[in-house]
Amino acid sequence: MTQRLLRLSLAHYRKDSCTEESCHYFGTALHAKQAATLHAKHGTLQYYQVYSTQAARDALDAFRRSLGADWTIDQHDLTVELYIRDLQTLRNIAADPEFASFYHLEEPYLSRRHVVASLGWVEAYVEEGKVVNVTDEGSEYRPGFGEFVGSGGELEKALA
C-alpha cells in the first residue's frame, strides 16, 4: 500500500524593501538550517523552499499565453512546503518555543499580509523520472477516495 502524505504550503510575498536576492539570502542563509532542524525534530518528512522571481513568473506567463491557457500566475515570492503524516506534527512544531523566534527573523524580509496557506494530500505518480504508484488498473493508493475521506477514514485521523 502506498501512503498518502499531507502537504502544507505557505506562500509569502517579500516586503517592498526586500530584493529577490535578499529574500533568497534570508531563506537559505538565515532560516533554512533553523527551520529544517525544527521541522525534522517534530517529524516533518520533507521541507522545501520554492522561490519564484519575476523572471520566472514572466516566463510562465509567456508559456501560458503560448498555450492559450486561462491561468492566473501566482505572484508570491517564496513558498514553503512541508510534507507530513498528520496535523499533529504541525501542532507540535507550533508549540515548540523555537518556532516563535521565526517571526522575528522573518520580519525584515517577508510580508505577513496575504500569506496563502493550503493543506491537502499528495499522491505521487512520477518520481526520479519514473512512473510510480500506478498500474493498468489505476492508482495503487489505498484505501480508495470514499474510504480515505469518509468518517473514521485515514484523512480524518490525520487531521485530528
Curated annotation (Swiss-Prot):
User: Which InterPro entries does this chain map to?
Assistant: EthD_dom
GO molecular function per UniProt: oxidoreductase activity
Quote the Pfam families the UniProt record gives: EthD (PF07110)
Instruction: Give the first-level EC class, as a single word.
Output: oxidoreductase
Supply the induction statement: Expression is positively controlled by the cluster-specific regulator ATEG_00326.
EC number per UniProt: 1.-.-.-
* Chain ranges of the EthD domain: 24-100
Assigned keywords, A-Z:
Oxidoreductase
**Protein family according to the UniProt entry:** Belongs to the tpcK family.
What's its job? Putative oxygenase; part of the gene cluster that mediates the biosynthesis of isoflavipucine. The PKS part of the PKS-NRPS ATEG_00325 probably assembles a triketide from an acetyl starter and two malonyl-CoA extender units. The poly-beta-keto intermediate would then be fused to the leucine unit by the NRPS part. The resulting amide would be liberated from the PKS-NRPS through reductive release of the linear PKS-NRPS product from the enzyme complex.
Name of the protein this chain belongs to: Putative oxygenase ATEG_00330
